[in-house]
């Protein structure tokens, strides 16, 4: 039975209570306050819903993750990185990145990054928890992604690309930095062929929860504005 969250409580049900079908649906309701979002990610779940739906919280089993040291870079991407066709920055224009991620796409109906979702993550960015990666071609923003950094874990949310392989350049650059900064795991949430091409793989939800317990409260060496 689906758990409905109360607005005055930031607690989530145990991950083991998530539904098998649809895979990982854990709870519904609540709000998108910064406190609840932080509680959700620390618990191992994330919001994902369409505009007009109640807020839905998910914790799929298995969980798709990328260990930074397992990053796979194709020959074509390695060549592109060497060419330095694009310039990559961090936390320079979070609002523009999340707005671009929310923009309509030809292969999808609607967007799950609603206006309320954008505002919620902008607040997390102001708190130094949500971060953006920008990919520039000259002075034009042509790609990027955003996510949350808590302890030694990075929770990826969404990416976009307006130029060939721009988001791939941004993601590969981010993973390299995360490894340098001592991050141990990148949460990719759901499997995609794009992520698997980088070396992402599925692990049991219980294993993912163990990483949360062991690494969420450990410091990293992150310097997002360096």
Curated annotation (Swiss-Prot):
Return the protein name.
Leucyl/phenylalanyl-tRNA--protein transferase
Localization terms from the record: Cytoplasm
- Origin species, per record, is Ectopseudomonas mendocina (strain ymp)
- Keywords, comma-separated and alphabetical: Acyltransferase, Cytoplasm, Transferase
Catalytic activity from the UniProt record: N-terminal L-lysyl-[protein] + L-leucyl-tRNA(Leu) = N-terminal L-leucyl-L-lysyl-[protein] + tRNA(Leu) + H(+); N-terminal L-arginyl-[protein] + L-leucyl-tRNA(Leu) = N-terminal L-leucyl-L-arginyl-[protein] + tRNA(Leu) + H(+); L-phenylalanyl-tRNA(Phe) + an N-terminal L-alpha-aminoacyl-[protein] = an N-terminal L-phenylalanyl-L-alpha-aminoacyl-[protein] + tRNA(Phe)
Write down the PANTHER family for this protein, in alphabetical order: LEUCYL/PHENYLALANYL-TRNA--PROTEIN TRANSFERASE, LEUCYL_PHENYLALANYL-TRNA--PROTEIN TRANSFERASE
Mainly resides where? cytoplasm
Q: Does the keyword Transport apply?
A: no
């Amino acid at each position: 039975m689906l758990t409905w969250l109360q607005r005055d409580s930031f607690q989530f049900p145990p991950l083991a209570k998530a539904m098998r079908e649809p895979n990982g649906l854990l709870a519904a309701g609540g709000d998108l306050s910064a406190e609840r979002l932080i509680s959700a990610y620390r618990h191992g779940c994330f919001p994902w819903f369409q505009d007009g739906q109640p807020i839905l919280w998910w914790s799929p089993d298995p969980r798709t993750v990328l260990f930074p040291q397992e990053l796979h870079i194709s020959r074509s991407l390695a060549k592109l990185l060497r060419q330095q066709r694009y310039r990559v920055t961090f936390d320079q224009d979070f609002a523009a990145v999340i707005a671009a991620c929310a923009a309509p796409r030809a292969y999808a109906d609607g967007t799950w990054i609603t206006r309320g979702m954008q505002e919620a993550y902008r607040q997390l960015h102001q708190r130094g928890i949500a971060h953006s990666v920008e990919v520039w071609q000259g002075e034009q923003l042509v790609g990027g992604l955003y996510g949350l950094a808590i302890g030694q874990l990075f929770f990826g949310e969404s990416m976009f690309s307006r130029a060939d392989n721009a988001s791939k350049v941004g993601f590969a650059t981010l993973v390299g930095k995360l490894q340098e900064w001592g991050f141990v795991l990148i949460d990719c949430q759901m499997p995609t062929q794009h992520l698997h091409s980088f070396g992402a793989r599925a692990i049991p939800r219980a294993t993912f929860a163990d990483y949360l317990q062991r690494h969420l409260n450990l410091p990293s060496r992150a310097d997002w504005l360096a």
